[in-house]
Each structure stands twice: as structure tokens, then as C-alpha cells.
């Protein structure tokens, strides 16, 4: 039986410095750094939709990439994402990707 051994550590961001050094760090580190940067720029301004903002920033490229990978096969995409196909269809519609 096939056993999946990929973990969230496989989700990395690769960067190249000005000295052509290549570094990889977990996606979560990049998300955390982006959030810290965003919060620092608020200058005390209230925000009430941060969860939705972050979710949209991650969810839309996730959907786009998975749909390309599965060549538009919604059943396969939903299975890969671990969600119901109906839920996938709603998310695709939300982002105008249907």
C-alpha cells in the first residue's frame, strides 16, 4: 500500500540573495514574517478581517495551482486538498475561478 510521507516541512520558500546564495525556509516562516510586516505597518489602525485576508492570500494561489496540477479535474483536486468537491466548487466560484 502507498504511504504518503510528505509533511508540511515539504512546503518551503526558496530565496536567492544578492550574493546568489540560495536559502530555503518553511512556508510558515514566510507567512509569519509577512504578518509581522503587515501588523507593523498598521500604526495602531484597527483591522477586523485579518483571518479572511490571510486565508484569501493563501487559498487563491493554492486553488489555482492545484487546478493546474490536476488539469481542471475537480474531483482529483478536492481529494488532494482533503475537501468535498462541493466545497471546492464554492471556493472556485468565490475567487472567480469556475
Swiss-Prot record:
Record's function text: Activates ribosomal RNA transcription. Plays a direct role in upstream activation of rRNA promoters.
Keyword terms of this UniProt record: Activator, DNA-binding, Transcription, Transcription regulation
A GO molecular function held by the record: DNA-binding transcription factor activity
Disulphide bonds in the chain: none
Family affiliation: Belongs to the transcriptional regulatory Fis family.
Subunit structure: Homodimer.
Location of the DNA-binding region in this protein: 74-93
InterPro entries (UniProt xref): Fis_DNA-bd, Homeodomain-like_sf, HTH_Fis, Trans_regulatory_Fis
Domain of life from the UniProt record: Bacteria
Keyword Transferase: no
Gene3D superfamilies: Homeodomain-like
Protein name: DNA-binding protein Fis
